[in-house]
Curated annotation (Swiss-Prot):
The gene is SBTM4. Glycans are attached at residues 182, 297, 325, 393, 468, 529, 706, 727. Residues 1-20 form the signal peptide. SUPFAM superfamilies: Subtilisin-like. It holds the Pfam family fn3_6. GO terms for molecular function: serine-type endopeptidase activity. Its main location: secreted. Required for arbuscular mycorrhiza (AM) development during AM symbiosis with AM fungi (e.g. Glomeromycota intraradices). This is Subtilisin-like protease 4. Residues 376-461 form the PA domain.
Length: 755
């Protein structure tokens, strides 16, 4: 009996928009509440004995056979909401507990769970990343021409200039998708747009059939990945320039899965199913849970595995639960897990105190009508109430703050913009928003409701000290506009989730960091205080923003190297990454101290070098099976991920997977092997350079790799041993090894945990 075991996905990542709502990931609701008597369940089943079901009608018939006979003959609204084909063997249905119990007794039933309701997590970057129109990777990849990027998000804004198809040919013949917008809305850029709303409708009765973006997040991420060139882009007069996505000539396929605050799991599963069926090349998922489940119960991991098997590259947000360790999500090794970094552009608003001190902060709203004269300065929390310090709604006394510059603290679960709205309601003239200690020097440029600036925690402490030092503190804000050239960029954003990787400690995560702070991209509607209703853009922050940067860059590599596997593209991105900032120093974090590998992974993406990496660490789909068996998963659990019946006849430790980085739990000595494939010059030679982690001896054999043809493979081994010379109290140490030729540097980070 040959069973095809596909478990339904607990669809991991959705997103929380990173604008005024801050950068923290929200709590995920564990299950939906459609009615008091029924819920939507994801049902996982096997295939029928001795049969291969490939046609949609056959699958639907099989799935319906699991329903109780009374439901089969019922004239009520159909109980089966979705029948899945590509990413799992199963269906979504609205059932009572009694009806579910009947389903569970059927032969072929595997498991079921209530669907989870998830919530969204949330111009200059091409130049910052070295992308130029007349040379380099853009030209070499033909700007991503012919590649299809599927974006699962909140929809799209058709007609926005970022989605113009000027100069873009029709989609390739393999495209099978459709456009559910009006006949003129889709074009050669926006080739597909669909809404998956059946679960949302069942839950709240709302009909939202059109894939129109109603809040901006989906439009922003889609244009970041593959927006067309748009001249004169700006936000309230700031960040002026030419806006463009990472792959400006790539096609976009939009799958709307979020309606209001709800992104139902079964709707997301249907969108993933469709994206694989439609023939996309890249899937971009700016979504995230607060904690990563094991891979066999991780919807993103399972869906991404199915996509990877078909040659589809999957890029996912790392999550916004930083800077805390072990907060990383989307940690499967077949996913590119993307953290967030700053760029070298700031939109500067300086807090100037009455004693002459100045502290640079950021704000998008910089009204020319604001006169920078010194005004009375007051701390919002002077009454000792925490809610006042956070400038919570209704917490400020109008008489105490009218006409003053008000110092508010970040946090309290209150959006940054909402704090400014409270200051404005109380009659305040301006706001200085100070960071909390956790976010330290990580700042966001927001469209505030009044003149404002967002300053660091250190600056806030000094401003508080000044307020306490005088009976008549004063301050103003100096708006300095857009400033390019911050030498500390790229730096890791405070909110960017960190490793270690809980589901698989032997795989270093995140894989890469990319631009995710104060990112300008398309927006559906004008912002408050905007006078231009035609060119609508907004600035957002989050790993939701860094993910589509890497999705677009992957599309460029796919265009340049159409025969590369998803693992080869991922390897090229990782081994070519930058580890120093524009000031030629090590990349720092929100504390301005050199960061560790759990924040950066391999480093910051460098598209030009990724397009010509020299060597790649390739992995074929079947190579993951012994790795998964080595995690201690049962054969059934591995089969859930692999979409077929599995025998764990062989298993390998995590470190033996042919991954472009090393994450080693080291007690006694360990030896791992790696195989690299030459994708550079046919005749080339690579020498070894090792920076061993403190307290670790690293031996590599051989120490020289010689190639005589393209696609030649060479294998090397690495032995890690403790030396006893390190700090006996340290838990982790880090280093790297790299293979260097006359043209290429192929770098792999090394993270060691002492056990």
């Amino acid at each position: 009996m040959d069973y095809f075991l596909f478990i339904a996905l607990t669809f991991l990542l959705t997103f929380h928009v990173h604008n005024a709502q801050g950068s923290e990931l929200p709590t995920t609701t564990t299950e939906s509440t459609e009615t008091s008597s029924s819920k939507i369940y994801i049902i996982h089943v096997t295939g029928p004995e001795g049969k291969m079901l490939t046609e949609s009608e056959d699958l639907e018939s099989w799935y319906h056979s699991f329903l109780p006979p009374t439901l089969m003959s019922s004239e009520e609204q159909p109980r089966v909401i979705y029948s899945y084909k590509n990413v799992l063997r199963g269906f979504a249905a609205s059932l009572t507990q009694e009806e579910l119990s009947a389903v569970e007794k059927k032969n072929g039933f595997i498991s079921a769970h209530p669907q989870r309701v998830l919530h969204r997590q949330t111009t200059h970057t091409p130049k910052f990343l070295g992308l130029q129109q007349d040379t380099g990777v853009w030209k070499e990849s033909n700007f991503g021409k012919g590649v299809i990027i599927g974006v699962l998000d909140s929809g799209i804004t058709p007609g926005h200039p970022s989605f113009s198809d000027v100069g873009i040919p029709p989609p390739p013949p393999k495209w099978k998708g459709r456009c559910d917008l009006n006949v003129t809305a889709c074009n050669n850029k926006l080739i597909g747009a669909r809404a998956f709303n059946l679960a949302a409708e069942a839950m709240n009765g709302k009909k939202a059939e059109a894939p129109i973006d109603e809040d901006g997040h989906g439009t922003h991420t889609a244009s970041t990945a593959a927006g067309a060139f748009v001249n004169y882009a700006e936000v309230l007069g700031n960040a002026k320039g030419t806006a463009a996505g990472m792959a400006p000539h790539a096609h976009l396929a939009i799958y709307k899965v979020c309606f209001g605050e709800d992104c139902p799991e079964s709707d997301i599963l249907a969108a993933l199913d469709a994206a694989v069926e439609d023939g996309v090349d890249v899937i971009s998922i700016s979504l995230g849970l607060s904690e990563p489940p094991p891979f066999f119960n991780d919807s993103t991991a399972i869906g991404a595995f199915a996509a990877m098997q078909k040659g589809i590259f999957v890029s996912c947000a790392a999550g916004n639960s930083g800077p805390f360790n072990s907060s990383i999500v989307n940690a499967a090794p077949w996913i590119l897990t993307v953290g967030a970094s700053t760029i070298d552009r700031r939109i500067v608003a300086t807090a100037k105190l009455g004693n002459g001190q100045e502290f640079d902060g950021e704000s998008v709203f910089q009204p020319s009508s604001f006169t920078p004269t010194l005004l009375p300065l007051a701390y919002a929390g002077k009454n000792g109430k925490e809610e006042s310090a956070f400038c919570a709604n209704g917490s400020l006394d109008d008489s105490a703050f009218r006409g003053k510059v008000v110092l508010c603290e970040r946090g309290g679960g209150i959006a940054r913009i909402a704090k400014g709205e409270e200051v404005k309601r109380a009659g305040g003239a301006a706001m200085i928003l100070m960071n909390d200690e956790t976010n330290a020097f990580s700042l966001s440029a927001d469209v505030h409701a009044l003149p404002a600036t967002h300053v660091s925690y250190a600056a806030g402490i000094e401003i508080k000290a000044y307020i306490n030092s005088t009976a008549t503190p004063t301050a103003t804000i100096l708006f300095k506009g857009t400033v390019i050239g911050n030498s500390l960029a790229p730096a890791v954003a405070s909110f960017s989730s960190r490793g270690p990787n809980l589901p698989s400690p032997g795989i270093l995560k995140p894989d890469i960091i990319g631009p995710g702070v104060n990112i300008l991209a398309a927006w559906p509607f004008p912002l408050s205080n905007s006078t231009d209703s035609k060119l609508t853009f907004n600035i957002e922050s989050g790993t939701s923003m860094s993910c589509p940067h890497l999705s677009g860059i992957a599309a460029l590599l796919k265009s340049s190297h159409p025969h590369w596997s998803p693992a080869a593209i991922k390897s090229a991105i990782m081994t070519s990454a930058d580890t120093i900032n524009l000031g030629n120093k090590l990349i720092v974090d929100e504390t301005l101290q050199p960061t560790d590998l759990f924040a950066t992974g391999s480093g910051h993406v460098n598209p030009s070098r990724a397009n010509d990496p020299g060597l790649v660490y390739d992995i074929q789909p079947d190579d993951y099976i012994p790795y998964l068996c080595g995690l201690g998963y049962s054969e059934t659990e591995v089969g859930i991920i692999a979409h077929r019946k599995i025998k764990c006849s062989a298993s390998i430790p995590e470190g033996e997977l042919n991954y472009p980085s090393f994450s080693v739990e080291l007690g006694s000595s360990k030896t791992f092997t790696r195989t690299v494939t030459n994708v550079g010059e046919a005749h080339s030679s690579y020498d070894l350079i090792v920076a061993a982690p403190q307290g670790v001896d690293v031996k590599v054999q051989p120490y020289k790799l010689n190639f005589s043809e393209v696609n030649q493979k060479e294998t090397y081994s690495v032995t890690f041993s403790r030396t006893g010379l390190g700090n006996k109290t340290q838990e982790y140490a880090q280093g790297f090894l790299k293979w260097v030729s006359t043209k290429h540097t192929v770098r792999s980070p090394i993270s060691v945990k002492f056990i």
